[in-house]
Curated annotation (Swiss-Prot):
GO molecular function: ATP binding; protein kinase activity; protein serine kinase activity; protein serine/threonine kinase activity
Biological function: Essential serine/threonine-protein kinase that regulates diverse cellular growth and survival processes including Wnt signaling, DNA repair and circadian rhythms. It can phosphorylate a large number of proteins. Casein kinases are operationally defined by their preferential utilization of acidic proteins such as caseins as substrates. Phosphorylates connexin-43/GJA1, MAP1A, SNAPIN, MAPT/TAU, TOP2A, DCK, HIF1A, EIF6, p53/TP53, DVL2, DVL3, ESR1, AIB1/NCOA3, DNMT1, PKD2, YAP1, PER1 and PER2. Central component of the circadian clock.
Species whose genome carries this gene: Oryctolagus cuniculus (Rabbit)
Residues annotated as domain Protein kinase: 1-81
Location of this chain's protein in the cell: Cytoplasm; Nucleus
E.C. no: 2.7.11.1, 2.7.11.26
Record InterPro entries: CK1_Ser-Thr_kinase, Kinase-like_dom_sf, Pkinase_fungal, Prot_kinase_dom
Gene Ontology biological process terms in this record: circadian regulation of gene expression; positive regulation of proteasomal ubiquitin-dependent protein catabolic process; protein phosphorylation; regulation of circadian rhythm; Wnt signaling pathway
Family listed: Belongs to the protein kinase superfamily. CK1 Ser/Thr protein kinase family. Casein kinase I subfamily.
Keywords assigned: ATP-binding, Cytoplasm, Kinase, Nucleotide-binding, Nucleus, Phosphoprotein, Serine/threonine-protein kinase, Transferase, Wnt signaling pathway
Organism taxonomic ancestry: Eukaryota, Metazoa, Chordata, Craniata, Vertebrata
This protein's name: Casein kinase I isoform delta
Regulation: Exhibits substrate-dependent heparin activation.
GO CC term, one of those recorded: cytoplasm
Length: 81
């Protein structure tokens, strides 16, 4: 779940650094043994913040890396406003 509260700015000499926190909902996307992609599941409940969730998430499709990029896009639009 990517949303604005997960991005922190450094202080002082590290003021140009962005820290990303809270990987509580992170999951593996490839099987460690076979290196095959783990199939998506459907009929999943919404996880994370609805405002920044991808369209697939709203449709009940399990989140993937693609959905993380879509959510990041929504967060960047939020920061721009």
């Amino acid at each position: 779940x990517i949303f604005p509260d997960n991005f922190l700015m450094g202080l002082g000499k590290k003021g140009n650094l962005v820290y990303i926190i809270d990987f509580g909902l992170a999951k593996k996307y490839r099987d460690a043994r076979t290196h095959q992609h783990i199939p998506y599941r459907e009929n999943k409940n919404l996880t994370g913040t609805a405002r920044y969730a991808s369209i697939n998430t709203h449709l009940g499709i399990e989140q993937s890396r693609r959905d993380d990029l879509e959510s990041l896009g929504y967060v960047l639009m939020y920061f721009n406003l």
